[in-house]
Amino acid sequence: MTSEVALFGKWSYSGVTCPDISLQDYICVKKNVFTPHSAGRYNKVRFRKAQCPIVERLANSMMMFGRNAGKKVMAVRIIEQAFEIIYLLTDKNPLQVLVEAVMNSGPREDSTRIGSAGTVRRQAVDVSPMRRVNHAVYLLTQGTRAAAFRNIRTVAECLADELINASKGSPNSYSIKQKDALERTAKSHR
């Protein structure tokens, strides 16, 4: 009897793909895990966090800031509830929705400061795939946190809403708004 490894015992990893070629190596969905907790030391070596499952990276990002810092069990529970809501609303695999949300939320272009002898100007630069994924996960969790603050809706509902809107590329999503603002400023600094 062989049983397939599924996230939270429900969501299958088979069929989850990343259509964006540049992000395929950095959005890790190949490691099949039951729960998004590996206790791995992904920050010890440069670029090793690319091997960390994307759901675990979302959980780690969810438990940042203030009163929720370090509460990984709570972060994992929020993600599990959000995935249930996503499945009920979209009838799609929540892992695929997450991959699409991360893919759509990462800015492709940014601006950096270039300065010499006191004069500073901004220059538009392309964003590396690793930074795109990092920034996308950060924007998704920041938008979720902002939506849930002083709101009757639960964090899981806000996370599900943010992921669904970001996967569709909807301007209602906080992460898509921030990405567009970043790319707009980068375009003005070309």
From Swiss-Prot:
A Pfam short name: Ribosomal_S7
Record bears the keyword DNA damage: no
Origin: domain of life: Eukaryota
Subcellular location: Cytoplasm; Nucleus, Nucleolus
Quaternary state and interactors: Component of the small ribosomal subunit. Part of the small subunit (SSU) processome, composed of more than 70 proteins and the RNA chaperone small nucleolar RNA (snoRNA) U3.
Record carries keyword Acetylation: yes
Function of the molecule: Component of the small ribosomal subunit. The ribosome is a large ribonucleoprotein complex responsible for the synthesis of proteins in the cell. Part of the small subunit (SSU) processome, first precursor of the small eukaryotic ribosomal subunit. During the assembly of the SSU processome in the nucleolus, many ribosome biogenesis factors, an RNA chaperone and ribosomal proteins associate with the nascent pre-rRNA and work in concert to generate RNA folding, modifications, rearrangements and cleavage as well as targeted degradation of pre-ribosomal RNA by the RNA exosome.
Protein name (record): Small ribosomal subunit protein uS7
Family the UniProt entry places it in: Belongs to the universal ribosomal protein uS7 family.
NCBIfam families tied to this protein: PRK04027.1 (NF003106), uS7_euk_arch (TIGR01028)
PANTHER family recorded: RIBOSOMAL PROTEIN S7
A molecular function GO annotation: rRNA binding
Example of a GO cellular component annotation carried by this entry: nucleolus
GO annotation terms (biological process): ribosomal small subunit assembly; ribosomal small subunit biogenesis; translation
Chief place where the protein resides: cytoplasm
Keywords, ordered alphabetically: Acetylation, Cytoplasm, Nucleus, Ribonucleoprotein, Ribosomal protein
Matching InterPro entries: Ribosomal_uS7, Ribosomal_uS7_CS, Ribosomal_uS7_dom, Ribosomal_uS7_dom_sf, Ribosomal_uS7_euk/arc
Species, as recorded: Dictyostelium discoideum (Social amoeba)
Modified residues (N-acetylthreonine): 2
